[in-house]
Amino acid sequence: MADLRANPDELLKAIKTEERGGYTGHLKIFFGYAAGVGKTYAMLKAAHAAKHRGIDVVVGYIERHSRPETMALLSSLEVLPPREVTHEGMAVPEFDLEGALKRKPQLILVDELAHTDAEDSRHVKRDQDIQELLRAGIDVYTTVNVQHIESRVDVVGKIIRT
């Protein structure tokens, strides 16, 4: 016979959501001292663990750098197609915020928190894209290097108050 009792964790989550006027996503930052130290790899490993727990995980944007380990981890995750923008005559992939909001996964991976978005983007900086995802109730995993922190102190403050 099925257990018809309510799950206390789900009840508590519903109460908190109602009290806050809606669920705000959680942010997890994979922090490193420089490029190539394994932030994206660690983020992808954590995403696989979340997927294994039944979380709806989508890759919003990953800077691939053609690393075989990164490519292998990407192969078993859903990857949203990037927006193609033209920069100095070249096609450049950009994170598709609109596509991510439309897809509305439980968890989205968006590499490079300190990235400056293309001119025709909704926001100037990727951290603003991430803030919008969080407000939409989507959990976000992202990466950042230490050299970007000093210049983004104000943004980090805004994100942790979201």
Language-model-detected regions and their locations in the chain:
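Extreme N-terminal, non-catalytic leader segments
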Residues: 1-30
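Short gly/ser/thr-rich secondary-structure transition/capping motifs
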Residues: 11-14, 88-94, 159-162
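Conserved P-loop
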Residues: 24-102
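Loop/turn-to-beta-strand initiation segments
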Residues: 56, 104-107, 133-142
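Conserved nucleotide-binding/hydrolysis micro-motifs of P-loop NTPases
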Residues: 63-68, 114-115, 140, 146-151
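Conserved ATPase-coupling elements of RecA-like P-loop NTPase cores
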Residues: 112-127, 151-154
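Conserved phosphate-handling catalytic cores of large alpha/beta enzymes
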Residues: 148-162
